[in-house]
Design a protein with these regions (language model features):
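Aromatic-anchored, charged helix-turn/loop surface patch used as a conserved interaction hotspot
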Residues: 3-11, 20-22, 27-107, 152-163
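C-terminal non-catalytic interaction appendages of large macromolecular assemblies
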Residues: 96-163
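Surface-exposed, charge/polar-rich loops and edge strands
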Residues: 14
Length: 163
């Protein structure tokens, strides 16, 4: 789909086309729709970013919690599964899996949402290092960093969707 085609869609079709880029949180796309037309991918991302930033604390926390744990063997969206496979998280050695599981649990306990990281282009070692480095952060810093990662993930997904 082209950006022009996306901009021409009615609200429901627009949300169907790109509402999934924010994991189980189509409200971002639904609100960004009114900012059409989008002259560039940057314009679309800026519109979605602006709507995300206007989200309530409850909406933002729900959006963060909608993401799966990295390296999890739980059910997840096709997009999340493909992204994690690309980073090698589907083929962790038992010790790596145990360490990632332990760090994910510590992170989730401390912050109340899963560790979020835009894994495209990253290795499993990059991800483990980032997770270890971010656990000591304060909650406010980590919420902000998690939202930055969500926006990076959404941008990658939009790049893959639009031609």
């Amino acid at each position: 789909m082209t950006l022009a085609q996306l901009s021409a869609l009615d609200r429901a079709a627009f949300v169907d086309a790109v509402g999934w880029v924010f994991e189980h949180s189509p409200w971002v796309a639904e609100r960004a729709w009114r900012r059409r037309p989008f002259g560039s991918l940057d314009d679309l991302v800026a519109a979605m970013t602006a709507e995300l930033e206007k989200g309530t604390d409850e909406e933002l926390l729900a959006l963060l919690r909608a993401h799966p744990d990295l390296g999890s063997r739980a059910r997840m969206t096709d997009a999340s599964r493909n992204e994690q496979e690309g980073a090698g998280l589907d083929s962790l050695a038992p010790a790596e899996f145990a360490r990632l599981h332990e760090l994910n649990a510590a992170y989730r306990t401390k912050f109340g949402f899963p560790f979020l990281y835009a894994v495209r282009g990253a290795t499993k070692h990059d991800i483990l290092e980032a997770l270890e480095a971010r656990i000591p952060a304060c909650r406010e810093e980590e919420v902000n960093e998690a939202l930055r990662q969500v926006l990076r993930i959404a941008r990658f997904r939009l790049e893959d969707t639009l031609s």
